[in-house]
Amino acid sequence: MILLHFVYSLWALLLIPLTNAEEFTPKVTKTIAQDSFDILSFDDSNTLIRKQDTSVTISFDDGETWEKVEGIEGEITWIYIDPFNRHDRAVATAMNGSYLYITNDQGKSWERITLPDSGESISPRECYIETHPLNKNYFLAKCNYCEKTEVNNDNEENSGDEEGQFEIFNITRCTDKVFASNDGGKSFSEIKSSLERNENSPISISDCGFAKTSKDSDLESSDTSIICLFQNMQLIMDEFSSPYTESKLVLTTDWGKSLKEFDQFKDKVVNGYRILKSHMVVLTQGDRYNDMSSMDVWVSNDLSNFKMAYMPTQLRHSMQGEIYEDAMGRIILPMSRERSDQEEDKGIVSEILISDSQGLKFSPIPWTANEVFGYINFYQPTYLKGTMIASLYPLSRRRNRKGKAKGVKSKGVTKISVDNGLTWTMLKVVDPDNADSFDCDITDFENCSLQNMFYTREGSTPTAGILMTTGIVGDGSVFDWGDQRTFISRDGGLTWKLAFDFPCLYAVGDYGNVIVAIPYNADEDDDPQSEFYYSLDQGKTWTEYQLETTIYPNEVMNTTPDGSGAKFILNGFTLAHMDGTTNFIYAIDFSTAFNDKTCEENDFEDWNLAEGKCVNGVKYKIRRRKQDAQCLVKKVFEDLQLFETACDKCTEADYECAFEFVRDATGKCVPDYNLIVLSDVCDKTKKKTVPVKPLQLVKGDKCKKPMTVKSVDISCEGVPKKGTNDKEIVVTENKFDFKIQFYQYFDTVTDESLLMINSRGEAYISHDGGQTIKRFDSNGETIIEVVFNPYYNSSAYLFGSKGSIFSTHDRGYSFMTAKLPEARQLGMPLDFNAKAQDTFIYYGGKNCESILSPECHAVAYLTNDGGETFTEMLDNAIHCEFAGSLFKYPSNEDMVMCQVKEKSSQTRSLVSSTDFFQDDKNTVFENIIGYLSTGGYIIVAVPHENNELRAYVTIDGTEFAEAKFPYDEDVGKQEAFTILESEKGSIFLHLATNLVPGRDFGNLLKSNSNGTSFVTLEHAVNRNTFGYVDFEKIQGLEGIILTNIVSNSDKVAENKEDKQLKTKITFNEGSDWNFLKPPKRDSEGKKFSCSSKSLDECSLHLHGYTERKDIRDTYSSGSALGMMFGVGNVGPNLLPYKECSTFFTTDGGETWAEVKKTPHQWEYGDHGGILVLVPENSETDSISYSTDFGKTWKDYKFCADKVLVKDITTVPRDSALRFLLFGEAADIGGSSFRTYTIDFRNIFERQCDFDITGKESADYKYSPLGSKSNCLFGHQTEFLRKTDENCFIGNIPLSEFSRNIKNCSCTRQDFECDYNFYKANDGTCKLVKGLSPANAADVCKKEPDLIEYFESSGYRKIPLSTCEGGLKLDAPSSPHACPGKEKEFKEKYSVSAGPFAFIFISILLIIFFAAWFVYDRGIRRNGGFARFGEIRLGDDGLIENNNTDRVVNNIVKSGFYVFSNIGSLLQHTKTNIAHAISKIRGRFGNRTGPSYSSLIHDQFLDEADDLLAGHDEDANDLSSFMDQGSNFEIEEDDVPTLEEEHTSYTDQPTTTDVPDTLPEGNEENIDRPDSTAPSNENQ
């Protein structure tokens, strides 16, 4: 019994601590305050401070009691603890910013620091202090001043003359000022910006910082070294709305008295910098005129020498403030995603790049590199060496809308690494007690693990491996806020257990032995009051503490930042009143837990980081309290101690790949050709190979015995040497086991995003021009179609094989997934509203068990919310257009037009509606072949009798007019026509005249401004069976068109010969045509074999549109003005493609040069500043490039093995310096598809200096396009062009900058023939035989406000021409009154009789008085008229009494001589004519009638009257077209010579460009009903 009693007593004694623990209740003290947030702790103290409304309050007892700080005046906007003096210093900033308060004794006393007068007219908006890690007296005060101002946009010098000028924003004017102090704020001196600021720079930034940012800084710098970045920004308004930036990065060591600029960045735009422990990182903007351009990263460890780091992708939106350095000296570089229009997506981290230990080679987290694009959470606790936790979530999942996400399985994933990222594992849930509460098998770690979502630094308080987080257990496919729970880990994050079924805020104390958690939602426990939970056994058990109020928790924190204390602050708020919040601040004290017991030695255990493995050459361990120990550590204000033991042997984990090597799929370091090019290993040898060690010891690794690393021989063949431009070219290669079937760029300047589809129907996205390519997760659906929105450049739609539609409005960064209507996909393209991004029409098949089912028919479905919901709009519709959004002046903005084909009918009708066919439905045409829209017109093809077509045109959707084609002798039935382009108020159309397959050709036509009246520009223009035409309008230049004609069209039509093609060019939009002038010598300096001076026999011919593999590969580029490439030959006709060479022009086609002997593919970059050629249809390992506009060419080897390049491409604007090659190479076991991204950014020394007002500068000059200053469209134009080949242009719309030197006199080239007139071989416009001019009075019907009209002269002025004076070939006839407007017409031209009669009578009276005076004084008193015959010169018989008499007599004598000479001349002429007639009759006998010689241009004006006599109806009376007061002489430059130009005056017409609205081609074809042409023609 005694023994039993003893055991019972002992058990009772052991139970006492546990009972005390269970019964323990923390001390909770409540404080109520108004608008109080951000409670701050002084390190190693019991003092807290917080801002309450606009004042500062302080607590000296861990938050139990608070008092207002006395001595602080004014309104306080911000308080913060000095990061380098956390124990005792804090700063409070005032609202007006001209002063602040500082404490150096934990808030007991505050000193007011007054900042110096900045010289600005206003007080600073805000100021804050930056301190020094080593010297408490060193301050940098940074202040921001803003005031609203109006920026003057006017530029009198340039106004009206130069086009494309930028407009400066009116914006708030802001300036940064930096003041430095070395005496604790007693005095300051300003560090003034070294940039001059002008009135157009509304933003001036000064960002300065001490070069030492930590007490253990490794940077080689003095304590007084200060780095400053000065920037001036000018916001420019163009279509990109992008700021222009100039910058200077400087160093000062004397507090701003002298500034030393970093030479390496003098010609660069520094976007930002970051000073780390052992590195300084500088980010430079690739393009100063595009703040969204890619950036380069420069790294230095001595503030003197900077090296450019290698980036695996484009860095565009770095989060500079988040760049930091880990314990191994590696730079962690977060990249934010593009600036989305979606507010919730802004500022989200999208990718984490980690450098090697040298800071020079960056790479992404390995398991995220090839996954779908998403956003990343990244956390690296400094007290857990080598530990990283990262979460990746695809943005496609984030953008799913409610009710539409059921079928979406886009998976996110969270992983952890405990060895510095060498290996990664899932966050394992090891919790058998709660296994049944999860929806998946937690023992299957790969498919059931903890997924973390939020970008927060969980567990930032140091603990011995005890972490908490919120998340969801699953495979990552479902993640919703309501599903989150709270989890805890005791092994540094490797395994986790469930803590709560709801998400919580949490904090830890006593090194993790005390944990406090509070639910975000007070209703989690089914009562309205809030509560918090606490654990005293490292999360094993939890106790609830009930609060009496419902609060929204804002923060919970340990009062000791090092996590050593056991006191906490909980700050929550309620929305008690409209003006602000009521805060409830709870001080929670656990210091007396376990009866105030302090842990002893046997209460502790060792916990090993990374499961005891070596990390950084060291094994780490922490002494921590055992989980069930009934005590607290109570080492308040002592930092958590980490014990380390160096590892004896180094392993591969202690090494990283050398710069020239990358890890392959197996983790082995293998040579990378592109990195070898960037390094200098081959610069030091002349041998073909060089030995290099593939591994290097990680900087800072502490393992004792290094490994033996064997060198690998690297090939140096083809590697450029240092000092050459080729050394700076960066190539990135990607290999695939599939072929890319489709690709297309998004046409924006934000980045170089493109979408690709492979042969398996998988979609891939790249945002850096193909450098990195990531697969799009389509949830297992094959992508069967891709549609880009032609009106919104960031939008595209992907169709899945299972009925899903994936839409993106941010160039593929995020996708919204929706289900298409329950209808069969017919493969018809979407039709978009030009003015509403989310509105489009989808076509699906209804009742289509089979596509051949009798009841299967098409239905047009309408969506107004981007595909979230669809409604049936119209049955049997196969093509609709939002007509109201297309017209400039629509009759109704909501009008929709649809082509309808009833199942029971073989015809198609055109219907319209203004309410999406709910109640309004109007039949426009009952029977059509098809219709299309282009350039503000809608053109409808209507069948006519005898299998002909007729075209009708509308410009408002209501009024349709028949398109009148010219009557011509060689035009038969109108069986097929192709709409080529509509621009500048005219439609270009190809009317087929021969439709025999393989022998197709036709006439090129051009319309008037409303598209209803066409004239022939050129005959026998080549087309193919698909309706495509050899026609291309040169981009960026007015009126230049290239076309191929069938020179032997008559014999081709008779089936006697195959086509023989010739290339023609026009410089005035088809009015006149010439053959291309051939170069005199080829690319080898040899003369061409054909040497005829006649261009008809020897000219340059180019392969055209009908032969292209990719119709996007045009001759020209809209940004490279005047430049064109083409594959062709010099000779009488065009030769087969393989026999041709590559030619180039820089003056819009006036002169050409051969650049390559074989066919090459080409691409333009940097607005023509970089040109690239690659062989076509032959394997190669090199490209040719030019940086001097094609004058010289260099070859560059871009890969080690030869590949067959399928295509070369770049961004649609041709403004980038990066090109993408698609190639195919033979590999063992088959072929592999490859892409090569070739980056030329670094070959240029600098960016060209551009004046945003368009003025000339050292790098840009205005010059004419060609070799002569010819007039084109009635004016002489000069274009702004780069003059220095060593600089690059960048994001400047250079093609928009031009200026008109003068308007020229009108010449024949400024006119074209009017309707029913044709251009004869002599260049004149003649009326078609048997026809009359068009009824000129029709214009009155179209324009009811007109009161008069004019008859046609046969000519009309080309719409683009601005000529003045000169020829008036389109001079109107006398005006005629419009029908019904006779009264107004008379009022306009009638003249009042009163004033006219007065003037007339006055003139008559003056004449009569003068005549009577002369007669009376000079004739009558001198003898009258009888004496006329007696007057002789010098006769002194006349009466002359005064000067008046002498003047009158002289007048009389002069009159006498004039009249007598006229009489004599008439008599003499009569006699000579009689003699001449007699001689002619005798010599020529019976020959009668005039004889005319052939007219050439030099004779045009001189012989016009003779030539055109008797042909007034042909509009050839030039005398009425000339300005009576003008000089009619035509200069030599204005009139071509017969030898050069006469061949252009044929009876053949011209061709036109491809409409921009078509996704694949720029041509639309409308054919006859019985045509055999393929389906891309409207039949």
Curated annotation (Swiss-Prot):
Which terms in the Gene Ontology molecular function aspect does this entry carry?
nucleotide binding; vacuolar sorting signal binding
Outline the segment boundaries, as ranges, of region: Disordered. 1533-1579
Name the UniProt key words of this record, in alphabetical order: Glycoprotein, Golgi apparatus, Membrane, Nucleotide-binding, Protein transport, Receptor, Repeat, Signal, Transmembrane, Transmembrane helix, Transport
Q: Would the keyword Zinc-finger turn up in this protein's UniProt record? A: no
In terms of Gene3D superfamilies, this protein maps to: 2.10.70.80, 2.120.10.10, 3.30.60.270, YVTN repeat-like/Quinoprotein amine dehydrogenase
Question: What highest taxon heads this organism's lineage?
Answer: Eukaryota
Record GO biological process:
Golgi to endosome transport; Golgi to vacuole transport; mitophagy; pexophagy; protein targeting to vacuole; vacuolar transport; vesicle targeting, trans-Golgi to endosome
Enumerate the glycosylated residues. 96, 170, 447, 793, 1010, 1303
Transmembrane intervals = 1398-1414
Query: How is the protein disposed in the membrane?
Result: Single-pass type I membrane protein
- Tell me which parts of the chain lie in the Lumenal compartment: 22-1397
Entries under InterPro entries matching the protein: Sialidase_sf, Sortilin_C, Sortilin_N, VPS10, VPS10-sortilin, WD40/YVTN_repeat-like_dom_sf
UniProt xrefs under Pfam families: Sortilin-Vps10, Sortilin_C
Q: What is its main location?
A: Golgi
The subcellular location is: Golgi apparatus, trans-Golgi network membrane; Prevacuolar compartment membrane
BNR repeat start-end pairs = 57-68, 101-112, 179-190, 415-426, 487-498, 533-544, 764-775, 861-872, 1143-1154, 1184-1195
- Additional note from the record: Present with 7210 molecules/cell in log phase SD medium.
Q: What is known of its domains?
A: The lumenal domain contains two regions of approximately 650 AA that exhibit 20% identity. The cytoplasmic domain serves as a Golgi retention/recycling signal.
What is the designated name of this protein? Vacuolar protein sorting/targeting protein VPS10
Identify the species of origin. Saccharomyces cerevisiae (strain ATCC 204508 / S288c)
Taxonomic placement = Eukaryota, Fungi, Dikarya, Ascomycota, Saccharomycotina
